[in-house]
């Protein structure tokens, strides 16, 4: 697995892209080829691998990315601000309201967040992750909630978002600690209301409507862990448009960030939905092009190439367009029950050393802050 292509795009995009608002010609002259050079090195290593495998004549190679990359632009969507404007989320007043415990939690959380921001760029992700584990779980959970929702009045909140992704949760009675929305009809009607109204959000500076669609979670996902997903998933023009409203006090739930706000961000490139899929080998159609491939199609395709049956419950399908006609034959499907799985799941445990290794790997990839 290669992670350098991800990291370099996040941190060097502004030097590579003349249309980026923070593009500087002098900096570009020094760092502008950094992304290209990383890809060149990856290409050379892939070439070396193919040279070794070509002699065998029976090996297929798939090059896959889980997403693409693009400019982290000035567009911003503040979901909690929009929810508040619809009367669906309440904020605590800024005049000292709230219990003493709430005030102390908020002060502690803000102090922790300021400390984390001052450490980013100075200390490795792995070290920060180890420091976090020194804190009691209960304290981390409480401060984490305050970091995401420092000003939310839960008694007047029917829906909310952590604002870092296109996710909306319903403050459901019986599930959430201070839930006020009744399961059943009230829950369904509230989701319907948000689905109908949110795509009408307009950025007044550009006239654009950045929300493409709002999905119910069961429209996109299924399985025994569906309840862990947000109640609604918001699809926008770009996945990086969702931003915490933070210190922004204006009325615009969709807006353009000013240069000073953009300059505060360490990353200048972000993910895009379209990644890459490149296939090479004796079973592949030379010069073929795929128009409707998705990431979930990779696993069933690999299983088929290995001569293994594909579970009927698995998402995705075999990318037959990429295969020679003779390689498409012999496609087999099988139920999980036939494979011996009863649907109850498998209990997996790690030693402390294994768990530490997994955490460090995830931190090194940037998934743990």
Q: What is each stretch, according to the model?
A:
Residues 351-369:
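Short acidic, low-complexity intrinsically disordered linear motifs used
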Residues 191-193, 201-229, 290-293, 297, ...:
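Polar, surface-exposed loop/tail segments
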Residues 1-17, 234:
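Active-site regions of oxyanion-processing enzymes, predominantly non-cytosolic
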């Amino acid at each position: 697995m290669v992670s350098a292509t991800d990291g370099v795009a996040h941190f060097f995009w502004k030097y590579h892209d003349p249309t980026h608002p923070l593009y500087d010609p002098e900096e570009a002259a020094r760092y502008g080829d950094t992304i290209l050079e990383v890809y060149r090195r990856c290409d050379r290593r892939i070439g070396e691998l193919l040279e070794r495998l070509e002699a065998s004549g029976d090996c297929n190679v798939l090059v896959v990315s889980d997403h693409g990359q693009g400019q982290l632009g000035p567009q911003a969507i503040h979901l909690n601000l929009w929810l508040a404007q619809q009367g669906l989320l309440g904020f605590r007043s800024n005049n000292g309201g709230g219990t003493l415990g709430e005030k102390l939690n908020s002060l502690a959380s803000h102090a922790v967040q300021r400390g984390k921001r001052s450490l980013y760029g100075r200390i490795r992700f792995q070290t920060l992750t180890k420091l976090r584990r020194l804190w009691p779980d209960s304290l981390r959970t409480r401060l984490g909630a305050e970091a995401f929702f420092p000003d939310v009045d839960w008694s007047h909140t029917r829906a909310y978002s952590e604002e870092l992704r296109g996710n909306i949760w319903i403050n459901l009675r019986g599930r959430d600690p201070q839930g006020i929305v009744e399961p059943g009809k009230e829950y369904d009607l509230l989701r319907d209301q948000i689905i109908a109204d949110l795509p009408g959000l307009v950025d007044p500076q550009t006239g654009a409507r950045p929300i493409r669609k709002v999905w119910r979670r069961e429209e996109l996902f299924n399985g025994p862990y569906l309840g862990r997903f947000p109640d609604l998933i918001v699809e926008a023009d770009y996945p990086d448009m969702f931003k915490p409203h933070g210190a922004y006090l204006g009325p615009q739930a969709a807006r353009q960030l000013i240069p000073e706000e953009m300059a505060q961000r360490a990353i200048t490139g972000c993910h895009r939905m379209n990644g890459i899929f490149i296939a090479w080998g004796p079973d592949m159609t030379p010069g073929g092009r795929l128009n409707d491939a998705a990431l979930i199609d990779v696993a069933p395709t690999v299983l088929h190439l290995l001569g293994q049956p594909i579970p009927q419950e698995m998402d995705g399908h075999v990318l037959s367009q990429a295969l020679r006609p003779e390689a498409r034959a012999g496609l087999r499907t099988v139920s999980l029950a036939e494979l011996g799985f009863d649907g109850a799941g498998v209990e997996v445990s790690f030693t402390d050393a294994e768990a530490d290794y997994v955490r460090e790997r995830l931190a090194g990839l940037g998934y743990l802050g």
